[in-house]
Amino acid sequence: SSDPILAGEFLLPAGSSSAAILDTFQHGEVIRRFVTIPEGLPSILVHERLMAEDHLTGEIPVPVEGSVLPDTYDFERGEARSAVLARMQAAMQNYLAEAWPKRAEDIAVDSVQEAVILASIVEKETGVARERRMVAGLYSNRVKDGMLLQADPTIIYPLTKGKPLGRRIRQSEIAAINDYNTYTMVGLPKGPITNPGREAIAAVLDPAETSARYMVADGTGGHAFAETLEEHNRNVAKWFEIRRQRGEM
């Protein structure tokens, strides 16, 4: 056959004839490789993950926080990292363009960017899928009420750019004044604190209807929610007791 030879990486069965090899090079399927970006992976770690893929080529900057849609992406050997990153960012833009017009009425955010910022907090605050809309509802209430969001991940982000802190948060860090710490500033941080997934964004665009304003860990990986500070303080006392029993305090 005089068909052109395709560029790419191919799988050749052992013992293939020269004719079969030529046919594979002309008409075969190029091997696709995969890279997965999990929900809540900050951009500094997205960058690390792409740079660690030996089959990709070229340099990329650390992407803007919140610009990458967590998912599994395929690529060919020798493809530019910049091309793969561009697909990840286009996927986020496409998802937001589709999701934003379907948002519920009277939500707490006024723009797509604000939705991504709040979704990044929801993403970092709960790993329990069934809680996402509840956590989004709670933070939406706090935004609307002009309350401090008091989200611990916003303390950590300026310190580590989203990498694990690896220790307890210090009192001085809780009191720090910067563009992200929601213990010392009313409203949303100046930007996202991670790359939120579809579910966290969807939760912010259609949060649970709840009167909850407070939450604390419940010892099972989830949270205990409360409408009043008094109720919340009881939940905090229970959490401290669980931690004492575990030898964490």
Explain the meaning of each model-derived region.
Residues 17, 42, 231:
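Residue-level recognition of oxygen-bearing side chains
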Residues 62-63:
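Short helix- or helix-capping micro-motifs
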Residues 31, 48-57, 66-249:
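Bacterial extracytoplasmic/cell-wall-associated proteins, especially those involved in peptidoglycan
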Residues 1-7, 38-44, 66:
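Acidic helix-start/capping segments at beta-turn-to-alpha-helix junctions
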Residues 1-30:
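Terminal hydrophobic membrane-targeting helix
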Residues 13, 38, 224:
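Small/polar loops that bind or transfer phosphate-bearing groups
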